[in-house]
Design a protein with these regions (language model features):
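Domain-level signature for proteins that mediate thiol-based redox and metal-cofactor handling
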Residues: 2-229
Length: 229
């Protein structure tokens, strides 16, 4: 994960055409996933994939809203996916180790295997979920911490604003998210929680120290360091 909003993204456009009822047809081209033609009506879907700075994570954009603006859902293991039919379905793929939902994308992290062989299974799962009109989450939404709180000190409010306006939009482009967890006024340490492609990314330490920490120290003199929790 690099904290450079202008960094080039590797984008592959994947056209996925679904014809219901029959199994997938192997075209011999890993970037195209087709289903056999049947008499039932077809549903066309275009799923875009983007590489992330974390080689173990790939970003899938279904061309429609996923969580919606400002909302995220992180599933670091299959045990945490109980309320999401899509997350549960993705974890049924043996190589999948983590799933993350952003505003309009899905990040999938693998434990092993080659993306060339893993992508068709993920694409088929995502496509089936949306074409069947299944809910993304079941039950009441979890309560989330308010971004801003009237009781926040001026320093905390300033830190939160910088994270919301400068950090989160940048890391979302890389398929992840960073959440403010706290500020220790006595030590000046800001605690952040990494999600999605950011978690376990080889470059996350560099991003925290060279990108986020330097920015926060520049704008908020009270900040001395940033650490992941």
């Amino acid at each position: 994960m690099y904290f450079y909003p202008g960094s080039k993204q590797i984008v592959n456009i994947i056209r996925v055409i679904k014809f219901l009822s029959l199994p997938a047809l192997d075209t011999g081209r890993p970037w195209v996933h087709l289903r056999k033609v049947v008499r039932t009506p077809s549903i066309a879907m275009f799923i875009q994939t983007e590489a992330t700075p974390n080689p173990a994570t790939l970003k899938f954009l279904p061309g429609r809203e996923v969580m919606g603006e400002g909302a995220v859902a992180d599933f670091p293991s299959a045990e945490t996916a109980g309320r999401s039919p899509l997350a549960k379905a993705l974890f049924e793929i043996p190589e999948v180790s983590r799933v993350f939902f952003g505003a309009d994308f899905i990040s999938v992290t693998k434990r092993d295997g080659d993306w060339k062989h893993l992508k068709p299974s993920i694409l088929g799962t995502v496509m089936e979920h949306f074409t069947r009109g299944l809910p993304l989450m079941e039950g009441a939404a979890d309560e989330t911490e308010e971004t801003y709180n009237d009781e926040d000190s001026d320093v905390v409010a300033q830190i939160k604003e910088l994270i919301e306006t400068r950090v989160r939009p940048a890391v979302a482009q890389d398929g992840g998210d960073i959440i403010f967890k706290g500020f220790d006024g006595s030590s000046g340490v800001v605690s952040l929680h990494l999600q999605g492609s950011c978690a376990g990314c080889p470059s996350s330490t560099m991003t925290l120290k060279n990108g986020i920490e330097n920015m926060l120290r520049h704008y908020v003199p009270e900040v001395t360091a940033v650490e992941a929790v």
